[in-house]
Amino acid sequence: MSQQLFKICLLISVLVGVLGLAQAQQSLDALLDRDIAGLVSTYKSLHAAPELSHFEEKTSAFVAKELRTLGYTVTERLGKYSRPEWKGYGVVGVLKNGAGPTVLVRSDLDALPVEEKTGLPYASKVRTKNDAGQDVAVMHACGHDIHITSLLGTARLLAELKDQWRGTLVLVGQPAEEATDGAKAMLDDGLYNLIPRPDYAIALHDIGDLEAGTLGVTPGFALANATKVDVTVRGIGGHGSRPETTKDPIVLAAQIVLALQTIVSRELGPLDPAVVTVGSIHGGTRANIISDEVKLQLTVRSYKEEVRQKILASIERIAKGTALAAGLPAELAPIVKVSDSEVTTATYNDPALTERLKNVFMKLVGDNKVFPVAPIMASEDFGRFGLEGNQIPTVMFWLGASDPAVLAESRRNGKPVPSLHSPFFAPVPEPTIRTGVKAMTAAVLALMKK
């Protein structure tokens, strides 16, 4: 009799859970039907008015105003940078709803120095001065406008659905993601003293490789760490007709660039992904002058910190060893400078939390619309919110943004769809935003349910 009773209770529990999920999904769909037109309008306004990293003043103020209107306690101007002229434009909105977990949801705010070529009626025409005083075009070419809109849509739904969750909800508008120092700036300015330390931190990122209306998940390492390295190769200059009297830094730089390619192929294990890219090389002023200096700019990427450290040590060894072999005196050895600002940690998705959210998403949009996504060597500073050693479980999931017809044509003709950072990157607004808001809201409800 007791076993029979147990089975009946279990069946009732399952039915109640399924019914509750169905009702919750219907509720989200109904609320989104009401809100979607306004959210798309918000997205188009944001897209047309992008701001560069460290200068997100209007975007930040807009997010703060919207969160206050929804009843969140808002703190503005959060962020402490290495350069005093950069102001902190971080925004934090907090909504307390009784005892329970603290969940942090983050969106980035900044745009890129890219001239938009989408031809859309709401395309950015913004031009501004960058940090170097150069006139540049600005575009939301990485979809942060989608992220902001999804955050605001989620903020509204969760404020209305307070009877379905408990705890403290923290919504973060983070500046300077593209510069990779915005998350650090907010943490250095006391973010985790301002709010309860999160039990979970989650974020989404749109991607052109997936159809709008679909989602992607990556357990474990999802994005790489990144470090900028500057190498100044010095030499002894002279006349181009008398190279024997010089130590040509252009030849040295060429040898160094080629030698750097062996770090990944010959010094690292094949199961440790890494990238060493020389993205910039500048030296000399005219054809008949052998210069005395060449400047290289590198990006170094890996998943593991120990791999990163090994690469950095190898760069210095190769640069200085090449100069020594060429007969340069010690006082003219290359100068290797590892940036302490243009550096960010890897994004590590907590496997258990990723699996939990994947199950939520599969029930929400269907098993056939949630895809595994392989780790990539691009970088994000969202992982910093998990603190060193991944103390706080974090997940960044992928939000499909492309027109299905465009993706289908891409598969047929082999021509890739416009990627993130492309001047042609153009998410399909309505289904992308709808899915982003729905998925993020469902994720928070699952983590904070009563």
Locations of regions flagged by a protein language model:
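Positively charged n-region of N-terminal signal peptides that target proteins for export
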Residues: 1-8
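Bacterial N-terminal signal peptides
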Residues: 8-20
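Acidic/His- and Gly-rich active-site-bordering loop/insert found
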Residues: 25-140, 149-153, 157-166
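Soluble non-cytosolic domains of exported or imported proteins
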Residues: 33-37, 50-61, 141, 145, ...
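Divalent metal-coordination and catalytic microenvironments
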Residues: 46, 93, 105, 144, ...
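Histidine/acidic-residue-rich, glycine-tolerant segments that coordinate divalent metal ions
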Residues: 90, 127-139, 145-146, 157-280, ...
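Metal-dependent amide/peptide-bond hydrolase catalytic core
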Residues: 251-450
